[in-house]
């Protein structure tokens, strides 16, 4: 198996689920280093937030941080960096129904499309569950990084 970098597939924001979605709810941080009740915690996946009718991708995201609207873009902020009055996204859903969309099916490989169609019945996989295929892909990715002069950081 030779590794091929997956392509990013942006959501189709013309779909009804996105066009009909409300704007994300923004609530001011009550004080420094504190998020309001019901704040949205970011994940490992790309996340979009609907603000003033437009979907914004949170860049430089990280898990378990807080999305803050700065008037132009979504910034992903660690709790220790929240400032009193920051406009923080609140909401607990990830399906666009609260103006928050977690794009967990965004990396597309040709062989995955074939597998997805063939094994559609195997959908009982959580985000935190690893499978043998995951380890095989990790091995191929590490080989690819070594061959192309990449830089691997193990955390």
Regions found by a protein language model. Name each.
Residues 1-155:
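Metallocofactor- and cofactor-centric catalytic cores in central/energy metabolism, strongly enriched
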């Amino acid at each position: 198996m030779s590794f091929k970098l997956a392509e990013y597939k942006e959501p189709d924001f013309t779909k009804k689920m996105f066009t009909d979605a409300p704007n994300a709810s923004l609530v001011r941080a009550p004080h420094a280093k504190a998020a309001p009740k019901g704040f949205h915690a970011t994940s490992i996946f790309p996340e979009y937030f609907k603000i003033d009718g437009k979907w914004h991708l949170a860049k430089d995201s990280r898990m378990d941080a807080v999305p803050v609207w700065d008037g132009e873009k979504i910034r992903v902020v660690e709790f220790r960096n929240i400032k009193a009055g920051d406009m923080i996204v609140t909401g607990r859903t990830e399906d666009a129904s609260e103006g928050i969309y977690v794009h967990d099916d965004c990396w597309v490989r040709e062989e995955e499309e074939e597998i997805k169609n063939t094994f559609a019945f195997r959908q009982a996989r959580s985000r935190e569950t690893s499978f043998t295929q995951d380890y095989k892909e990790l091995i191929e990715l590490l080989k690819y990084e070594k061959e192309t002069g990449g830089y691997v950081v193990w955390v």
